[in-house]
């Protein structure tokens, strides 16, 4: 059997079909193709001459009927800055309804009551769903370092006639159904310019490492019992492999030729929205309560602008602990830093603010527009064309050393002392006896501590 005749069989079950022409109109397939595939269905003894399902067909529907669903909601949603500092992305409200609640209701509407939500980041905020919607929660404790491959591996044992659903989608029309006959992966109908996915004429999903013309993937998938077992086997076998730490679970659907082992399900792109960024949420629902974050209010107040004048918000990956983002306001680019959780124990924000106050107007660092010493929020003007020093470039090093000497000779002073070696001891004390994640830590530490006597000798200068 193939996708075409299975689609026709499903239509025959769900619609009162009188003739082939009606079946062609409803399916979108040509009349010639419908006639050919209908003949095949009758040869397989699945449909009789009057478009009635046989007992064999009813058994097939029963075998593949949806049983449960898994909603993936463990990740940070890093691109959702600044919203993700307050709310996990599954709970973002669109049209006064959290995304995940809408998905749960759509699943329940087709009879799916066995729903498991895989949580991680801000997992406590999802707990109310257990009481309100009788869903189950599974925890991915590695959500901070690993991708959703591990989220699905957490629930590999329950996969079988299962919908797998990302939590960051808003679907105008439900993509779920009471009947399914084959495994599928959801993509948009519209051809887009930049995609790693393409549906070919054979109704196959082909993936590529390079972006090109193709279809937009939406992440929703249905797995029959047979295909779910194959996926679960791969998830469990590969879970311990480091190469999959950043993998999406969909790699388990690819064969050796980068072709998916499941069929495509195409949906009108105008009826489904993936919300990965603040801008996408604003585009879908300008009145969403989650657009009013503390960070955006701080920007509005500091720059004297309205929320709508803050545009082109873009996450910045740089920084070990901070959640920073780039934005534009009235043609000027800025960076806002939102300190990561727990960093107030590592950095004295009031001392940091004192340093920036002393540096103000000296053209030594970035231009600080706003700084809050209580919560560490900082807005700076974006430096276009700036780059880090190339430690392998002699000319770069000479310029940097000259700048450091100039800075040192300016003899700027603050009211506190920063002892780098004591800070190193303090940071390492937070490990509670555990060794460093970095293999060359001991070697680097030896080199740094080797400078201590030199620094101590000249620090008075």
Predicted regions and their residues:
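Conserved alpha/beta core of the MobA/IspD/sugar-nucleotide pyrophosphorylase nucleotidyltransferase superfamily
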Residues: 13-16, 52-69, 217-301
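Short amphipathic alpha-helical interaction segments
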Residues: 28-40
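A short, conserved structural fragment
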Residues: 42-51
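N-terminal glycine-rich phosphate-binding loop and ensuing alpha1 helix
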Residues: 5, 9-15, 20-22, 26-27, ...
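An alpha-helical support segment within catalytic cores of ATP-dependent transferases
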Residues: 295-309, 412-461
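ATP-binding pocket architecture of kinase catalytic cores
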Residues: 314-421, 436-443
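Conserved beta-loop-beta/alpha segment of the NTase-like Rossmann-fold superfamily
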Residues: 126-196
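Conserved core of the sugar-phosphate nucleotidyltransferase
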Residues: 7, 172-244, 249-252
């Amino acid at each position: 059997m193939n996708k075409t005749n299975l689609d026709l069989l499903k239509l025959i079950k769900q619609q009162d079909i009188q003739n082939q022409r009606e079946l062609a109109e409803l399916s979108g397939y040509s009349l010639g193709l419908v006639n050919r595939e209908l003949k095949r269905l009758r040869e397989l003894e699945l449909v009789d001459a009057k478009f009635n399902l046989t007992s064999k067909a009813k058994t097939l529907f029963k075998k593949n009927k949806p049983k449960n669903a898994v909603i993936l909601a463990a990740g940070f949603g890093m691109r959702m800055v600044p919203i993700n500092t307050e709310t996990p992305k599954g709970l973002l409200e669109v049209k006064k309804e959290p995304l995940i609640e809408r998905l749960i209701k759509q699943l329940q509407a087709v009879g799916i009551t066995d729903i498991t939500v895989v949580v991680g980041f801000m997992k406590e905020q999802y707990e109310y769903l257990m009481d309100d919607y009788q869903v189950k929660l599974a925890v991915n404790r590695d959500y901070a370092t690993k991708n959703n491959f591990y989220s699905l591996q957490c629930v590999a044992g329950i996969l079988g006639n299962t919908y797998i659903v990302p939590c960051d989608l808003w679907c105008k029309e439900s993509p779920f159904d009471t009947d399914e006959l084959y495994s599928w992966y959801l993509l948009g109908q519209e051809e887009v310019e930049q995609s790693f996915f393409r549906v070919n004429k054979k109704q196959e999903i082909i993936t590529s490492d390079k972006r090109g013309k193709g279809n937009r993937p939406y992440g929703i998938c249905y797995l029959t019992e047979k295909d779910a077992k194959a996926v679960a086997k791969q998830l469990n076998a590969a879970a311990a492999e480091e190469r999959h730490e950043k993998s999406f679970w969909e790699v388990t659907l690819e064969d050796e030729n980068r072709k998916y082992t499941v069929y495509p399900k195409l949906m009108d792109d105008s009826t489904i929205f993936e919300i990965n960024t603040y801008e996408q949420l604003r585009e879908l629902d300008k009145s969403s309560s989650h657009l009013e974050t503390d960070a955006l209010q701080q920007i509005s107040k500091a720059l004297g602008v309205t929320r709508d004048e803050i545009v082109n918000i873009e996450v910045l990956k740089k920084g070990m602990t901070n959640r920073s983002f780039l934005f534009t306001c009235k043609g000027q680019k800025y960076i806002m830093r939102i300190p990561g959780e727990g960093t107030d124990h590592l950095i004295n924000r009031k001392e940091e603010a004192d340093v920036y106050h002393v540096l103000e107007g000296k053209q030594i660092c970035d231009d600080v527009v706003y700084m809050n010493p209580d919560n560490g929020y900082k807005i700076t003007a974006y430096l276009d064309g700036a780059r880090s020093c190339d430690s392998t470039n002699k000319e770069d090093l000479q310029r940097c050393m000259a700048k450091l000497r100039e800075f040192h000779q300016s003899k700027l002073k603050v009211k506190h002392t920063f002892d780098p070696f004591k800070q190193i001891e303090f940071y390492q004390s937070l490990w509670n006896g555990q060794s460093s994640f970095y293999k060359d830590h001991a070697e680097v530490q030896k080199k740094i501590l080797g400078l201590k006597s030199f620094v101590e000798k000249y620090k008075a200068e």
